[in-house]
Curated annotation (Swiss-Prot):
Species the sequence originates in: Arabidopsis thaliana
Cofactor(s) the record lists: Fe cation
Molecular functions (GO terms): oxidoreductase activity, acting on paired donors, with oxidation of a pair of donors resulting in the reduction of molecular oxygen to two molecules of water
Motif (Histidine box-3): 246-250
Coiled-coil annotated spans: none
Keyword Nuclease applies: no
Protein name: Delta-9 desaturase-like 2 protein
GO biological process, alphabetically ordered: unsaturated fatty acid biosynthetic process
């Protein structure tokens, strides 16, 4: 096993990939079955959406998908995972709760997995590297809890969040919040709203996030020496709210801004900048010129 050092001084362990185990013919935990059922239900509702079309339902689904998935990138990713900026708790918690409605899990689980990804990028301990195949990195890893635990170990990398009652509460009551959300949507607008909001909107959010894990480690360009497969994929920037400038992100993990060039669309950064201008987002981290010179690929 070898070790490389990133620009922020953190180490990243590399090792030889383990032989990939059988996927279908294995023990499925209750959590695996539950998550697969949720993802399957969302995709089924998406398939039903065209047969339940209403303009107002379609419009609401698009708006809610944008808002909840922006909360994933703003809250779960840049605020909670990387501490790229700081918010007052009265603002941090509502954003985290809104991200919960994007159906990508509770904050403790999401943040832990992503921190492991950066700690073990493209090694046999990376929870979702495309070295085990596109579809594994895109979605299949989600349904194999035991394998992820075997690769990464105990999820003791989120103690900063576990110390807060709010995040422990969300983890324990995740299913109740999701069921309540789905029920309210159905009671408000019936099947059209359910299919376009939970189904269509959920699928957009799922695959936007998943493409960062898969496509952004396979295709695209590299501007920085990150010693991994991370890529900048311009055509995913809008769908991912700026997350697809993934090589930028792996080079400067704690940066609140992923689209480092003026022409690199980064909607999440624009929101962070807005709150910074209001004095609500503080300790906003950006790479220095010295860090950029150190990490730049010499052409």
């Amino acid at each position: 096993m070898s070790e490389t050092t990133k620009d922020d001084g953190s180490s990243q362990k590399k090792s030889v990939r383990k032989e990939k185990r059988a996927y279908v013919l294995r023990k499925w935990t209750q959590f695996d079955v539950g998550r697969a059922s949720t993802v399957g239900t969302v995709h089924l509702l998406c398939l039903l959406a065209p047969f339940n079309y209403k303009w107002e339902a379609f419009r609401f689904g698009i708006i809610l998908a944008i808002l909840t998935n922006l909360c994933i990138t703003f809250s779960y990713h840049r605020n909670l995972t990387h501490r790229s900026f700081k918010l007052p708790k009265w603002l941090e918690y509502p954003f985290a709760y809104s991200a919960l409605l994007a159906l990508q899990g509770d904050p403790l689980d999401w943040v832990s997995i992503h921190r492991f990804h950066h700690q073990f990028t493209d090694s046999d301990r990376d929870p979702h590297s495309p070295i085990e195949g596109f579809w594994f990195s895109h979605v299949l890893w989600i349904f194999d809890t035991d394998y992820i635990r075997e690769k990464c170990g105990r999820r003791n990398n989120v103690m900063d969040l576990k110390q807060q009652w709010f995040y422990r509460f969300l983890k324990k009551t995740l299913v109740l919040h999701i069921l309540a959300f789905w029920t309210l949507i159905y009671l408000w607008g019936g099947l059209p709203y359910l299919t376009w909001t939970v189904g269509f909107g959920g699928v957009i959010g799922y695959h936007g996030t998943w493409l960062v894990n898969s496509a952004c480690h396979i295709c695209g360009s590299q501007a920085w020496q990150t010693n991994d497969t991370s890529r900048n994929v311009w055509w995913l920037a809008l769908l991912t709210m700026g997350e697809s400038w993934h090589n930028n992100h792996h080079a400067f993990e704690t940066s609140a801004r992923h689209g480092l060039e003026w022409y690199q669309l980064d909607i999440t950064w624009y929101l962070i900048w807005f709150f910074q201008a209001l004095g609500l987002a503080t300790n906003v981290k950006l790479p220095t010129d010295a860090q950029k010179r150190k990490m730049a690929i010499r052409r």
